[in-house]
């Protein structure tokens, strides 16, 4: 039985490289997108032409209903989600004092809460199976902070903290939760 990876933000630069690496390593890859449908479809076509297994799925990680629908569709197509890669995110370069409350909420919703919701959607089955991995793609700004990216930095710092706490909570069930900064995200994920 092939292992299934669900990758959010799978149509973008880092996400598409993660999808390629996983597909090349024999994974069934759910390439999830919100805004990059054409790029996601092009990536899946490229992978299928090479005899690799991938499908496109729409997912707005800022919306719980969209997450639940996406996870259900991935399960229907591929079965058990063995690996979740929370890669989707958004960033704006803007002074914190100029940021609207709506933009602040969007940063937290997409960069932190979206990953938490995606994890919550796949974890019950992983816990039942005593198997699975959650990888959260973070940023060096979550560790160091960045001027004009205060909300993004805070959300990514929260994602790092979430990952550490989640790892402790799910380890007893045989599940791993790890984070990688995007500077290292291009490294192979084959050993996870």
Model regions and ranges:
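Conserved glycine-rich cofactor-binding loop
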Residues: 11-12
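Conserved glycine-rich Rossmann-like NAD(P)H-binding loop of the short-chain dehydrogenase/reductase
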Residues: 27-41
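Substrate-binding pocket helix/loop in short-chain dehydrogenase/reductase
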Residues: 95-96, 103-108
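Active-site helix of classical SDR
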Residues: 119, 155, 163
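Alpha-helical segment proximal to the catalytic Tyr-Lys
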Residues: 124, 168-172
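Residue(s) in the substrate-gating loop at a strand-loop-helix junction
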Residues: 139
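Conserved small/polar residues in nucleotide/adenosyl-binding loops
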Residues: 181-188
């Amino acid at each position: 039985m092939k292992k299934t990876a669900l990758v959010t933000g799978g149509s973008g630069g880092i996400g598409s490289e993660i999808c390629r690496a996983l597909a090349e390593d024999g994974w069934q890859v759910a390439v999830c997108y919100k805004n990059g449908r054409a790029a996601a479809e092009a990536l899946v076509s490229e992978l299928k032409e090479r005899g690799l297994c991938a499908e496109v799925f729409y997912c707005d990680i800022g919306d719980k209903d969209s997450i639940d629908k996406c996870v259900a569709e991935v399960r229907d197509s591929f079965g058990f989600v063995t690996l979740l890669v929370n890669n989707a995110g958004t960033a704006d370069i803007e002074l914190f004092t100029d940021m609207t409350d709506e933009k602040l909420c969007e940063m937290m919703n997409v960069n932190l809460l979206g990953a938490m919701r995606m994890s919550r959607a796949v974890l019950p089955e992983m816990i039942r199976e005593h198997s699975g991995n959650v990888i959260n793609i973070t940023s060096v700004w979550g560790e160091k902070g960045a001027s004009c990216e205060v909300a993004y930095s805070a959300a990514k710092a929260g994602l790092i903290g979430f990952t550490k706490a989640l790892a402790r909570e799910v380890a007893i069930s045989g599940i791993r939760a790890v984070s990688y900064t995007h500077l290292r995200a291009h490294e192979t994920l084959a050993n996870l």
